[in-house]
Amino acid sequence: MCPEQPHDTRAERDEMSEQTQQAAQPAETAAYDVRAIQDKWLPVWERLDPFRADDSSPREKKYALTMFPYPSGDLHMGHAEVTALHDVVARYWWQRGYEVLNPMGWDSFGLPAENAAIRNDEHPATYTYANIETQYESFKRYAVSFDWSRRLHTSDPEYYRWTQWLFLKFRERGLAYRKSSPVNWCPNDQTVLANEQVVDGRCERCGAEVTKRELTQWYFKITDYAQELLDRLDDLEPTWPARVVTAQRNWIGRSEGAHVDFVVDGRDEPITVYTTRPDTIFGTTFMVVAVDSPLAAELVTDAQRPAFEAYREEIRKETEIERLSTDRPKTGVDLGVTATNPVTGTQIPVWATDYVLADYGTGAVMGVPGGDQRDWEFATEMGLDIVRTTQTPEGFDGEAYHGEGPAINSPAPGADAPLDINGLPVDEAKRATIEFLEQQGTGAGAVNFRLRDWLLSRQRYWGVPIPIIHCDACGEVAVPYDQLPLELPELRGADLKPKGVSPLAAAEEWVNVACPECGGAATRDSDTMDTFVDSSWYFLRYCSPDYTEGPFDVEKAKAWMPADIYVGGVEHAVLHLLYARFFTKVLRDMGMLEVDEPFAAQLNQGIVINQGKKMSKSLGNGVSLGDQLAEFGVDAVRVTLVFAGPPEDDIDWADVSPAGALRFLQRAWRLSGDVTSEAGTPAAGGDVALRRVTARTVHDAAELIESYRFNVMVARVMELVNATRKAIDGAPGPADPAVREATETVAILLSLVAPYVAEEMWERLGHEPTVARVGWPEVDPALLVEEQVTAVVQIQGKVRARLEVAPDISEADLEQLAMADPAVVRAIDGRPVRKVIVRAPKLVNVVV
């Protein structure tokens, strides 16, 4: 299946709109009790349990995965959309004869539960598990084909035992480590944030302005896998949404350039900077160092220290977004030292500034004002030299120029330098400069990544405790594996209020322990893990949720993985999806997985909006899923969401009609009561025209589902309902076997989007439940061969006649037939024919 399919054409949308109107017109009044049908079939499905995946089944396996929800309140319209779309695929695979794993669980650690516990003076588990049960009952009523035997919650100790186990295994491989560094700090939630959780300088969760704080934190070394994470995106490109692949490529941010060593007065070790344009080194007229970096504090002279410290305090009050703003004046302080340009040998000043960040490389950047706009502005502000090293295009009237062109001033005319790259294009100039640096031992070619290691420590309570003990004598000591899970102590209400350190730090009985190695006094690590750690492997636990010997049964994971489709929002493109890919690769290298990627294909749904805007309480445009289900029923809401448009498009609830969907379902349901032939009657002797419509619908539905054009699939079912109603009310009548075949096909196809009405139809047609597992309708290939097609005859571009012809008619015969048609003869009206263009069997174009 491939998500990258073209959207429906305007003609298709118009056709679908027409079909909706036709299918929604009831031919008669009939009793159709939505609530009674739902109440009838839900307990039957619970008893039959038709969607329990059998690990030992000999059938080919499919893994249908949707992103598990956070348990905050009941399900909303977004949940309804994603699960309705996802369920089309899962139910389709069951009908096609696959053994399908379609599990569900809850991402149940996180801040909302902790904040609710503070407000309500309770334990976070109270809020969490109450909401889980509410959502669980709603999912069941919504009739999603989940295998509930595999249900999991990431906040259960039997789950997070294995999250802790994985952390320790990563640590043993050098992939989990602790360091002190400036981190993103949310002053509202009083916790650190990973780079990916900062959007435009603000906390993605609460919107507070993010500040920097120096803390010792735990990290996952995701950068060890940066190149592979990037390279394997090529494999995912055919089956993942293009915008997700692009977002991950940009986030990983691979660039090729060079490390260049600058010797600084009074310092034994050179300062190494990374640049993507080593060819511009002749234009390096200064060096800038992040003002809040340890390097700046080390380099500053005593004479400049007062000015430096005052400037540093001023900058510490600024947010990262303010520091990186392109429209603010550049500021800085001369550190009073110079560095030596390794190519020209000239001395250049070293400045501290706010527009370089401490966590970028070494925190130092070579200033090339002729090729970088920020450097240009800084040099202009501080009165520093500006030297262009790349020839600008004719007519260029800008400031810094970073584009292509021959090297100039490299070296400057008359200058004596050991390297001359003047006249070389950029790529050749870069190579020549790197070769020189490597020969001189003052630099080397290098690859750099924008991706930074994953900061996973959080200073909150409701998360996975980090299984590390700190001992003055032994250092960091892992909690022994046989003592996992390390469970959270019982804290509630005011005990959880943010204090800048984790609430666990105040749980003295829990935090103070004996060192497992020496037996001396020690303390537990009081931070908890980022909840994205929990969700980076949950899809593997689904393969064997009750397994007690490891995080998952390796053999069962081998049978089910990778997930064949993963459905969820695009907002997780560079967070959850990147982290899950990282975990999969580490587990593969540990010998626990055989796959390189966790998700073979991915589908991103749009969002449900209302009146052209995202739903919000402040705008008063919210739509309650519960109200919609109560008024129109589950099936009508599901059909509305699936039929609204391509899955990746947003749905404006003001523009769709659950009432129209309900009328369509009533019309489909009536068919099952009007069929008079017995169940099991062979269809072979039935009306051929209707059988052709049925066969074509089944054939098209399969292709449309596999290309994620679910909305068009629903339109085809609407067409079949109309054709069947016409056959019942006219010829060949309700007793014709083709009418039964068509109606049974409607029920099977509707089981993918409207399971309640489909089950009711199936029973009324004389069958036992469940229609969801009867199998895909078989199609006689002969019925797909058209007996006649319509050929259009145009004269001067205007349609003058339509002819019913055989699909294999020759161009000569079609031309002869068209030219003899009375309407064509009248339209030509004796004028000489200049040209006849024939495209058999569909078109004849006459030019007079």
From Swiss-Prot:
<dbReference type="InterPro" id="IPR002300">
    <property type="entry name" value="aa-tRNA-synth_Ia"/>
</dbReference>
<feature type="compositionally biased region" description="Basic and acidic residues">
    <location>
        <begin position="1"/>
        <end position="16"/>
    </location>
</feature>
<dbReference type="InterPro" id="IPR025709">
    <property type="entry name" value="Leu_tRNA-synth_edit"/>
</dbReference>
<feature type="short sequence motif" description="'KMSKS' region">
    <location>
        <begin position="614"/>
        <end position="618"/>
    </location>
</feature>
<dbReference type="Pfam" id="PF13603">
    <property type="entry name" value="tRNA-synt_1_2"/>
</dbReference>
<protein>
    <recommendedName>
        <fullName>Leucine--tRNA ligase</fullName>
        <ecNumber>6.1.1.4</ecNumber>
    </recommendedName>
</protein>
<keyword id="KW-0030">Aminoacyl-tRNA synthetase</keyword>
<dbReference type="GO" id="GO:0005524">
    <property type="term" value="F:ATP binding"/>
</dbReference>
<dbReference type="Pfam" id="PF08264">
    <property type="entry name" value="Anticodon_1"/>
</dbReference>
<dbReference type="InterPro" id="IPR009008">
    <property type="entry name" value="Val/Leu/Ile-tRNA-synth_edit"/>
</dbReference>
<dbReference type="InterPro" id="IPR013155">
    <property type="entry name" value="M/V/L/I-tRNA-synth_anticd-bd"/>
</dbReference>
<feature type="compositionally biased region" description="Low complexity">
    <location>
        <begin position="18"/>
        <end position="30"/>
    </location>
</feature>
<feature type="region of interest" description="Disordered">
    <location>
        <begin position="1"/>
        <end position="30"/>
    </location>
</feature>
<dbReference type="InterPro" id="IPR014729">
    <property type="entry name" value="Rossmann-like_a/b/a_fold"/>
</dbReference>
<dbReference type="GO" id="GO:0002161">
    <property type="term" value="F:aminoacyl-tRNA deacylase activity"/>
</dbReference>
<keyword id="KW-0547">Nucleotide-binding</keyword>
<dbReference type="GO" id="GO:0004823">
    <property type="term" value="F:leucine-tRNA ligase activity"/>
</dbReference>
<feature type="short sequence motif" description="'HIGH' region">
    <location>
        <begin position="69"/>
        <end position="79"/>
    </location>
</feature>
<dbReference type="InterPro" id="IPR002302">
    <property type="entry name" value="Leu-tRNA-ligase"/>
</dbReference>
<comment type="similarity">
    <text>Belongs to the class-I aminoacyl-tRNA synthetase family.</text>
</comment>
<dbReference type="InterPro" id="IPR009080">
    <property type="entry name" value="tRNAsynth_Ia_anticodon-bd"/>
</dbReference>
<keyword id="KW-0067">ATP-binding</keyword>
<keyword id="KW-0436">Ligase</keyword>
<keyword id="KW-0963">Cytoplasm</keyword>
<keyword id="KW-0648">Protein biosynthesis</keyword>
<dbReference type="Pfam" id="PF00133">
    <property type="entry name" value="tRNA-synt_1"/>
</dbReference>
<dbReference type="GO" id="GO:0006429">
    <property type="term" value="P:leucyl-tRNA aminoacylation"/>
</dbReference>
<dbReference type="GO" id="GO:0005829">
    <property type="term" value="C:cytosol"/>
</dbReference>
<dbReference type="InterPro" id="IPR001412">
    <property type="entry name" value="aa-tRNA-synth_I_CS"/>
</dbReference>
<feature type="binding site">
    <location>
        <position position="617"/>
    </location>
    <ligand>
        <name>ATP</name>
    </ligand>
</feature>
